[in-house]
């Protein structure tokens, strides 16, 4: 997380076929919706600019988390109240922590506005 925002996010997956549980907390977000995505690279040397595009190994279109046709990195939005920590609680069946399409080592980006 770049800028004034900071936080911790955990990714848990029991088996390669199980959904991934994403939990955590982000501080310092302005009130409203913020895009929550996994980007292609784990490089943060130039902030979010060096993280590349959304993780999309299957060349799909941008979409909502429930869409069949979506980037693997499209995890939807998180809702910030603006005056308290923003909870992250997502269960996703498309991302994985196993194999060639694993999100391990990639960058999570919280976008300023959804």
Swiss-Prot record:
Q: Summarize subunit and interaction data from the UniProt record for this chain.
A: Homodimer.
Query: Which UniProt keywords are given for this protein, alphabetically ordered?
Result: Antioxidant, Copper, Cytoplasm, Metal-binding, Oxidoreductase, Zinc
**Gene3D superfamilies assigned to the protein according to its UniProt record, in alphabetical order:** Superoxide dismutase, copper/zinc binding domain
Could you tell me which species this protein originates from? Drosophila obscura (Fruit fly)
Could you tell me what the cofactor note in this record states?
Answer: Binds 1 copper ion per subunit.
The uppermost taxa in this organism's lineage are: Eukaryota, Metazoa, Ecdysozoa, Arthropoda, Hexapoda
Enzyme class, top EC level, equals oxidoreductase
Which GO MF terms does the UniProt record name? copper ion binding; superoxide dismutase activity
Q: Which Pfam families match?
A: Sod_Cu
List the protein's name. Answer: Superoxide dismutase [Cu-Zn]
């Amino acid at each position: 997380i770049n800028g004034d925002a900071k936080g911790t996010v955990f990714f848990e997956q029991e088996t390669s076929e199980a959904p991934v549980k994403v939990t955590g907390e982000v501080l310092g977000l302005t009130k409203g919706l913020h895009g929550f995505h996994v980007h292609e690279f784990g490089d943060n040397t130039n902030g979010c600019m060096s993280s590349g595009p959304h993780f999309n190994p299957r060349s799909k279109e941008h979409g909502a988390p429930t869409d069949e046709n979506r980037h693997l990195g499209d995890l939807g939005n998180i809702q910030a109240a603006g005056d308290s920590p923003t909870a992250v609680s997502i269960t996703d069946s498309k991302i994985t922590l196993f194999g060639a399409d694993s999100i391990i080592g990639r960058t999570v980006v919280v976008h300023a506005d959804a």
